[in-house]
A protein has these predicted regions:
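Catalytic phosphate/metal-binding cores of nucleic-acid and nucleotide-processing enzymes, i.e., regions
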Residues: 1-119
Length: 119
């Protein structure tokens, strides 16, 4: 049986649902784009040891897709590794949009479909 990966922290991006992560984990619950940006910057280079749990619909102008695009750009600009991610959005179009941001990153920079594709 494979052991679950231990992360430095979980960033839970959702304006409605509370984190569905054991309370023994380091969790940052952010509900807006601005809170997300602030939290990611606070983690700095440690962001590459985190996992981000994305919701798409945040009830404001910017959504989870905007957060994903900003995260990839910020990691690239600062030469930080891109964190693992999970998408808990019930919005199928939003889910696919967020996935496409990460898929594009892996295709462009590593010529792979995803982080988990065999080399």
């Amino acid at each position: 049986m494979e052991r679950m990966k231990k992360y430095f922290a979980h960033i839970w991006l959702d304006d409605f649902r509370s984190p569905m992560i054991p309370q023994t984990e380091n969790i940052a619950w952010v509900k807006t784009y601005d809170e997300f940006v602030t939290q990611v910057k606070a983690f700095g280079k440690d962001i590459s040891s985190c996992i981000v749990h994305f919701d798409h619909d945040l009830g404001e102008d910017k959504d989870g897709y905007d957060c994903a695009k900003w995260l990839i750009d910020w990691c690239l600009e600062n030469d930080y590794g891109v964190p693992d991610y999970d998408i808990q959005s019930a919005n199928p179009v939003g889910r696919k949009n967020i996935e496409s941001v990460f898929e594009s990153y892996w295709k462009v920079f590593f010529n792979k479909e995803s982080k988990y594709e065999a080399v």
